[in-house]
Amino acid sequence: MNEDVRLVAWVRGRVQGVGFRWFTRAKALEIGGLSGFALNLDDGRVQVVAEGAREGCQGLLDWLQGDDTPGRVDGVTEMWDTPRGSYDGFLIR
């Protein structure tokens, strides 16, 4: 079963000022069926919120944790929840 879920991920490392949010949005659009956003946080992390099919959210998480991201990812903290359905598209904030 590929139910809809909400993924919240906090990405640590050198992830600001390197196009990380732009590439995250591009990857979400490439996967398709995801809505949400990528946001720079004041502490240097990037927060990624994605809602959609579990398979798509897992694909985005796998990409965030992989070696194909811009900058340098030192770690990703994730949280899974039920979707809120309050996003239209995938935005850079």
UniProtKB/Swiss-Prot annotation:
Full protein name: Acylphosphatase
EC number(s) given by UniProt: 3.6.1.7
Any Pfam family: Acylphosphatase
InterPro entries: Acylphosphatase, Acylphosphatase-like_dom, Acylphosphatase-like_dom_sf, Acylphosphatase_CS
Catalytic activity: an acyl phosphate + H2O = a carboxylate + phosphate + H(+)
Catalytic residues, chain numbering: R21, N40
Source organism, top-level taxon: Bacteria
Keywords, comma-separated and alphabetical: Hydrolase
Keyword Membrane: no
Organism expressing this protein natively: Streptomyces avermitilis (strain ATCC 31267 / DSM 46492 / JCM 5070 / NBRC 14893 / NCIMB 12804 / NRRL 8165 / MA-4680)
UniProt record similarity statement: Belongs to the acylphosphatase family.
Residue ranges of every copy of the Acylphosphatase-like domain listed in the record: 6-93
GO MF terms, alphabetically ordered: acylphosphatase activity
Database matches in PROSITE patterns: ACYLPHOSPHATASE_1, ACYLPHOSPHATASE_3
